[in-house]
Amino acid sequence: KDFKLNTQCSAGNGYFLQSTCVGFGFDVKEYADLAFAAKAMPMFGYGCAVFMQSDIVDFQRQGWQPEEIMAGLANVLPKNIWLYVSQIPNLASLGRTFILQGGTQHNLAAVKAQVDFIASRFKDKGTKPNVIVHEHCGESGAIGAALEVRRLYGRGQRTKFIGFEAVEKIRYLTHRNENTRCYFCKNKCMRTFIDVQI
């Protein structure tokens, strides 16, 4: 089966940056160089990528250039991650060391924005954060999952996977109505809830 990453949710920040870059006619590998070349950038509000997509259109109408818009998107990325998705405004409460992971960290504009944002959250804390980009940032999630499986297997825990034949027989119901509407931001998106019956 084909799987398509969600192109709208802010949890998919890397894909959003990539699709914006490609939409402007550039290869994603050019993103950082283009963003760093910008002399100014528009200020995006953080939150839902659907809303940010409409901001892109508005900024284009106002005359902002693609590289300036891409710089603005990279700049707002940490706010989406820490304030919108994770909802952790006090980063110092997590400790001093931050390891950035995920394929987005191949984009140096995104990395710089993360480092700057994290450092800004330590400004009056009397200490500085230690920000590290994982050596295998694009694969770090899979590496972590494999290490966790090995740890659990070593403790005698076995899989609860029901098998592919049983998976094909799973029944589910979807619900999409006013009761599933999200009020987390001003967009008030309609969500689909899926109830799985095994």
Annotated model-derived regions:
Residues 2-40, 147, 151, 196-197:
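Glycine-rich phosphate-binding loop plus the immediately following alpha-helix
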Residues 14-22, 132-164:
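Glycine-rich phosphate-binding/hydrolytic loop that grips phosphoryl groups
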